[in-house]
Amino acid sequence: MKNIILQYKKKYDAGEPISVVTCYDYTFATLFNRTDVDCLLVGDSLGMVIQGNQSTLPVTLDEIIYHTKAVCKGAPDKTIIADLPFLSYQTSIEEGIRSAGRVLKETNASCVKLEGDSEFIIELTKRMTESGIPVFAHLGLTPQSVHTLGGHRVQGKTEAARNKMIRKSRELAEAGAFALLLEMVPESLGKEITESIRIPTIGIGAGKYTSGQVLVMQDLLGLNEDFHPKFLKKFGNLSGAVKEAVNAYHKEVTKREYPSEAHVFLDT
């Protein structure tokens, strides 16, 4: 497993954009391991795209560990980011460090990702870093706080909100975060934050000036036909390919064309 801090620093220093995609299972991890993508994120977004929930809040630490183990097995050549899910780290510094420690010890992940900018999160970032746990920070739209943010909407649109996010970005970097995810913020704010801190920024709906980009695999592959946010470009249409393949299978089964002689075991 590569060292994610060294990987990100090398690309950041060279001005090379960093590509990240989410992944939740062994099969896709083996495919992504054979691609050029830099890094995989086992996000608590699995609560929505895998479990069918309306938010990320129901995801548990054990579920993150389960999925991260599978991804690490399938993609040994990639660096792996693991989300810490809702209420696995917000209750106390000790609980946060314990949860992060479990993820790193049990999964072989490269780092953990924390959402938020409170004084508690900044202190937790500092304490985790001091404990040898690499921390990936996350600002802007933070899905674990979706109820207090008023839903899934662009953040940092007012001058006060912009200034606060810039300030908190600096504080998180100073606390030891080695990278920062910026989600659903105006492009100009993504650019300003990226230029104001000396760690890589990874954007999702944060414009083209961040140090890299991340997308949910189901979205970029075109597996979710009903999801069309402004920031998303679908780089494939796998939903159509999947339906075509399953319908072809169904047709051959009902016509007794499958299995053919090529797919059965003969007596001789």
Swiss-Prot record:
Enzyme Commission (EC) number: 2.1.2.11
GO BP terms in the entry: pantothenate biosynthetic process
Top EC class for this record: transferase
UniProt-annotated binding residues for Mg(2+): 44, 83, 115
Cofactor: Mg(2+)
Superkingdom classification of source: Bacteria
Reactions it catalyzes: 3-methyl-2-oxobutanoate + (6R)-5,10-methylene-5,6,7,8-tetrahydrofolate + H2O = 2-dehydropantoate + (6S)-5,6,7,8-tetrahydrofolate
InterPro entries, sorted: Pantoate_hydroxy_MeTrfase, Pyrv/PenolPyrv_kinase-like_dom, Pyrv_kinase-like_dom_sf
Active site residues according to the UniProt entry: 183 (proton acceptor)
Keywords: Cytoplasm, Magnesium, Metal-binding, Pantothenate biosynthesis, Transferase
Record-level Gene Ontology MF annotations: 3-methyl-2-oxobutanoate hydroxymethyltransferase activity; magnesium ion binding
Main location, first listed in the record: cytoplasm
Subcellular location: Cytoplasm
Cofactor mode of binding and number, as noted: Binds 1 Mg(2+) ion per subunit.
Binding site for 3-methyl-2-oxobutanoate: 44-45, 83, 113
Pfam families in UniProt: Pantoate_transf
Annotated metabolic or biological route of this protein: Cofactor biosynthesis; (R)-pantothenate biosynthesis; (R)-pantoate from 3-methyl-2-oxobutanoate: step 1/2
GO (cellular component) term, any one: cytoplasm
Subunit structure, as described in the record: Homodecamer; pentamer of dimers.
Family matches, as NCBIfam families: panB, PRK00311.1
Family: Belongs to the PanB family.
Role summary: Catalyzes the reversible reaction in which hydroxymethyl group from 5,10-methylenetetrahydrofolate is transferred onto alpha-ketoisovalerate to form ketopantoate.
Name by which UniProt lists this protein: 3-methyl-2-oxobutanoate hydroxymethyltransferase
